[in-house]
Amino acid sequence: MHDLFYCKLAGDDAERCLALAAVLQNAPDFVLLEQVFAPEADIFCFAFLPVQKPFRFKCDFVYGQIISSGEHWTAAETAALEAAVNRIAEKMFQTAG
């Protein structure tokens, strides 16, 4: 596994990470492949449809969020995934001012 990017809008807040993972499950560009619940983390495995590759969104209750994949992602593919996740996070976590 290698890290792809860090979603700053979700940060390492477990509630925000879990909320983002829940919204990704219903987003049209994402397909939930697997969900694993462990005492130290909740792990959500998704396929990102525009590039047809899987990634893992881990909400680690000790270390924070980890967005990673066992597959090779090009810089352009990673940027597309990051932009899609950030668009969703921006809508969720908009704050005034």
What are the roles of these predicted feature ranges?
Residues 1-40:
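Negatively charged, low-complexity tracts enriched in Asp/Glu with abundant Ser/Thr
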Residues 20-24, 70-97:
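Ampiphathic alpha-helical segments that act as solvent-exposed interaction surfaces
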Residues 38-62:
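Short, intrinsically disordered low-complexity segments
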